[in-house]
Amino acid sequence: MKKLLIYLYFSCCTVLLCAQNPESAFQFLQLPVSSHAASLGGDNISILEDDPELSYHNPALLTNVSSHLLNFSYMNYLQQTNVLGAGYTAAVGERSMLGVKAHYLDFGKMKNTDAEGNIIGDFTAKDILLMGTYSFDFSDHFAGGVSSKLIYSNYGQVYSLALGIDLGINYYNPDYMLSASLVARNLGRQVKTYDEIQEPLPFNLLAGISKDLAHAPVRLSLTLTDLHKWQAEDFYNRGDNSWSSILLRHIIIGADIFPTSNTYLSMGYNFRLHSELKNTTKRTFEGFSAGIGLEMSRIKIGISYGKYHVAASSLMMNFAIML
């Protein structure tokens, strides 16, 4: 309990000191990495699964993952952007886990123009993330975790380097089949700026809860995002600035259905994505996502699909194997 109180105190102090404005660099850090989390509305910090990619969303969840899992991920994002990832997990003693992962984003070739708009050539853009995660079971109900990040972006002739950390805590009560989490994501700063102007990382404070139903193979999830700011400056306003509209933009909901003990079907809805990217002329499915997962003795597979706009979507696949 003493370790837990120290961890909570450090987490709260760090959040209060490092809350940052939304005009931040390295926006790729907000993309989902777990196909399961992506299928539940694009983010989830409270489901407990043997899925190493979930530790990207909440480092405390790594304590639920098996040791010696080698995992790979791929996402096609908005058609021309490809995201590749790989990671590995290992137990450290009886109550702690260590994980490492790397992610590479390739935006492809783009036209390079001068100040007058004349095309003068092509340039490439890429982002790279190296991350290490440590998680620890404080007790039978509480787990905490921390992730350290080395972040690199290169766009044409300019590049930037940053250091960041994520802090997470999870509470689980098996009697009520209830899991609750709190995460402070992307604390840190640039160590090499693009043009000598310091830009913050995309800080996010999240809370989440997941509950298994007692008499049905269903789990419901609620995730709250951007809790450190009520109305973010980057909320795109379509004219509805009411209290209820702003509240909904902080909410992500999701549901898992378990047809068998080793499969899941999931779906989610992101209110903010729907509000800001919806087609105003016809009813479409912006903000909706869905996925499927299969777990065998040594192999785990997950696939998700998310709709962001009438002309843009994402497809993500995770694969893990026990060595």
What does each of the following model-derived ranges do?
Residues 1-23, 255, 323:
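Bacterial Sec-dependent N-terminal signal peptides
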Residues 20-323:
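Subset of outer-membrane beta-barrel
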